């Protein structure tokens, strides 16, 4: 009996020790897993921003270093795609933040009621226009411009009117304003300069428009293949050729009437699942570690110039004398009618 009891106690002790050990091991396995469960911030942006050559990867790493979270990207093809997805998803959107909305779509985006006020007094921004939006925070910007190869085009037009009025002027490639942010920008540029004569101006220019492309990359690729004398792009585009290819023959034309602005915006979603992280990301957008990646990461001017200044590739870029930008609400109310005007004037 004694031996039996001893045996039982021994077995019981071993079982207890085994149970404790099992619980300790199980705890050791569970605790790190729990520790690794971080909140996820979902940022909706356009695909090239997070693509192979965009700044997205570096920005994700930099934000995750300090946020104690995981940053996940939700992508659409372009700025217009971001707005369309916002409207489609509505209150059920997975996004906490939208990043990369074109300012020309800001009025329409704000009218959805899906965006939250940023609630900040923004620092001084290095932009050619004053900024007062209570919803949107700009993170980069650029002037739209026609880019050309100075070894092939010796006398580029010096104004938009000259480009439109010269029947023997350069052949150009532009983007479709229904599917492209720069294309929409050019539509507004024509409207701002030509007013109620925008339709006739399009009709004059149409014979020298090689094609309207869906997006910027298609247009620029055709230009580089020699399909046109000029392409609608940005004054910052030559910086890429300088920095990446050591080529200096690509130039951008500054027009006498001024050049239209392209401004990219960030905003927090009112329906954000992670509102505190969304607020931190909006702060991050204007930080040094975000802004310093814009010039040679997104090939645009930063909204707030980093302490180190702009890279050398930006030092010779043309600076237009005037920046054009139509009020958000006016664009929201007029865009569809102006596109109809463009369609009627350019249809073949």
Predicted feature descriptions by range:
Residues 104-108, 224, 228-249, 298:
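A ligand-binding cleft/hinge motif common to bilobed small-molecule-binding domains
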Residues 128, 142, 202-206, 212-213, ...:
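Periplasmic-binding protein-like
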């Amino acid at each position: 009996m004694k031996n039996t009891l001893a045996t039982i106690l021994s077995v019981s002790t071993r079982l207890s020790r085994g149970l404790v050990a099992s619980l300790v091991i199980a705890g050791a396995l569970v605790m790190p897993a729990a520790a690794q469960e971080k909140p996820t911030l979902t940022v909706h942006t356009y695909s090239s921003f997070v693509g192979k050559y965009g700044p997205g990867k570096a920005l994700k790493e930099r934000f995750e270093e300090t946020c104690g979270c995981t940053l996940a990207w939700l992508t659409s093809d372009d700025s217009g795609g971001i707005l369309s997805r916002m409207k489609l998803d509505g209150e059920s959107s997975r996004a906490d933040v939208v990043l990369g909305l074109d300012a020309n779509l800001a009025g329409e985006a704000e009218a959805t009621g899906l965006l939250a006020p940023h609630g900040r007094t923004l620092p001084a921004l290095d932009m050619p226009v004053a900024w007062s939006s209570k919803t949107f925070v700009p993170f980069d910007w650029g002037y739209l411009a026609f880019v050309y190869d100075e070894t092939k085009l010796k006398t580029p037009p010096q104004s938009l009117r000259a480009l439109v009025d010269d029947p023997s002027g350069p052949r150009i490639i532009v983007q479709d304003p229904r599917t492209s942010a720069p294309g929409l920008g050019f539509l507004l540029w024509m409207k701002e300069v030509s007013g109620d004569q925008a339709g006739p101006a399009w009709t004059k220019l149409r014979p020298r428009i090689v094609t309207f492309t869906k997006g910027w990359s298609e247009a620029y690729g055709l230009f580089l293949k020699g399909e046109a004398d000029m392409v609608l792009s940005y004054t910052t585009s030559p910086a890429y050729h300088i920095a990446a290819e050591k080529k200096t023959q690509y130039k951008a034309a500054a027009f006498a009437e001024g050049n239209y602005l392209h401004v990219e915006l960030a905003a927090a979603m009112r329906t954000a699942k992670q509102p505190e992280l969304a607020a931190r990301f909006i702060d991050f957008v204007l930080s040094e570690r975000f802004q310093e990646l814009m010039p040679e990461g997104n090939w645009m001017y930063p909204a707030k110039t980093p302490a180190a200044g702009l890279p050398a590739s930006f030092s010779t870029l043309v600076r237009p004398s005037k920046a054009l930008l139509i009020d958000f609400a006016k664009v929201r109310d007029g865009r569809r009618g102006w596109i109809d005007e463009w369609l009627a004037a350019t249809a073949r």
